[in-house]
């Protein structure tokens, strides 16, 4: 993981790739990116952006509960946002900065978790 993508939540280091790997195990998840967003309580908290497979109907809350049931207490996600696609660079890398900025611009800047 790139160091700038690492999430520091309550003094613990959380690697987005670990959380993305768990979410990718879900049968209805096609693509996923996890970013850290500001939290009054924890400093930062993990937030997942998920693209569902065609025809999938899993709700964000159900996916959140499923993932948090598999993750350690420190790694738990604050929220899951279902999106149509993830922004990518010309070489196919997910642009996590754009996801973070869009989330904050939408007025959801504090995911207290």
List each language-model region with its residue ranges.
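AMP-binding/adenylate-forming catalytic core of the ANL superfamily
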Residues: 1-75, 84-87, 92-94, 98-101
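Acidic/polar alpha-helix N-cap and adjacent early helical turns
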Residues: 101-113
